[in-house]
Amino acid sequence: VGVVCRYLRDTFQCRGAVPVHPPLLFPPSDEYGEESNIVRLLDKTGNVVFLPFDLTVPFARICARSGHMRLKRFDIADVYRENLLAGGQPRAVLAASYDIISQEPDPSAEAEVLALMYELLQMPGLAGEAWNVELSHESILRVFLQRFPAQFHSALLEALPQYLARGSDARVRHLLGSAGMPVSLLDEVDAWNIYEDFDTAVHTLAELLTPEERTKLAEPLAHLVSVVRLAREFSVQSKIYLVPLFSHSHTHYRNGTMMAVSKMSSGGKHRDVLAVGGRYDELLRRFSYPRIGSSQEPRHGVGLQIAVGKMVKAVARYQQSHVPRFLGRPEQERTLGPWTPRRCECYIASSQPGLLESKIQICKTLWSNGISADLQYECAAGESPEVTVSTCRAEGILFLILLRAHTSAVKVKEVITRTEHEVAREGLTTFLQDRIARQRRVDQMTVGVRPRESDTQRLSTSLKGGYHSNIK
């Protein structure tokens, strides 16, 4: 989890985003409609408050009431679901969010988010899977719904996610049929179930539209065309699918672009969503304070929420299948891979008790030179080196430093290559810096996409305090 979160943080910061974390609790909101999994709590005054169900709505609320007109932000935090067990603690799900706030509804913002999606899909584990980048517009969904009597709208919105996974599957048709929808309207839904490359899908959709509908959708479709064109400028090379029946969190993105990364699993019967987002200008407007004259310009926002847990599972699968192969390489090319969690780079131990002070001194020296290290306490001193090496390998530690009595030299065991070196204490720091740098170069040559920082690098200055948000 830590490796993936660091990679996401570095990716977001590379684009100029700063960390902004909204308050944990916020007042009840109608934005979630009839959602039953929201965690509702009582504060000390007896008022109902919500835990975050997603990362978009809480941020939109504080952003709409702040002075920010131009901002890129990110957040990596838990969102919460009601526990099915009565009285059980809310279920926490780790998510990441990337948002762009601007003064104009520029399609460049959506294009940049699509580029971010594309880059994330190059990660090991995700790159080998059939993830698709999907694009739509909330106006297309509304035009579709207007073709049906209002009494069927709720049933349609409930069935559309399943429709995207199963097409005209009999079970989905039965769901709509049980709501009283006639066969002619079911065929209409089938006709709109388009899932094609963007340019092809635009032509297919145009053939279904009436002249009045073409007029309504001319501007939204032109906006989507600009988004796709600019996404290509951002070097997005994958197919972008136009999905008219896209309805995920559509209430957040009213009159705006909607996008997602998904794949089909279980033989096409299940649609697995990795990320979802879109343009939420209307959400910002609804949360804004009432405008007095022209004192406050409208804000425009585009955001993406990512299921971090699914990324973690994908990377774990990749590591499980590839690490044995990495370790089977020639000695100078062996690696655990850049995605292996690494507790620290060095572990300082001794072959006998009584050397704790020396271990502390070496540990302090390594820390002061930016090398992450841990030391063995007296209770474990004298432990078998084989057992210690095995523990280091399981924790991703690169070097085991063994101290011995009556000698100024230490023994350094390289955990990956299983080689040993006799190193004088005064030259230990230089030796380790050289070996760590060499190991990082080997790690970086292992795969094309990798974390931008080592697992042990501390948080950057911007996270420590280089940026001070004035959002309240």
Predicted feature residues:
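Intrinsic-disorder-associated interaction segments
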Residues: 134, 149, 153, 165, ...
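Acidic, His- and aromatic-enriched active-site or binding-groove loops in soluble protein domains
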Residues: 38-46, 149-185, 262-265
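Glycine-rich, mobile lid/loop segments that gate access to catalytic sites or pores
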Residues: 132-149
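N-terminal alpha-helical transmembrane segments of multi-pass membrane transport
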Residues: 17-19
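Positively charged, Gly/Ser-enriched RNA/tRNA-binding surfaces
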Residues: 3-15, 25-27, 34, 46, ...
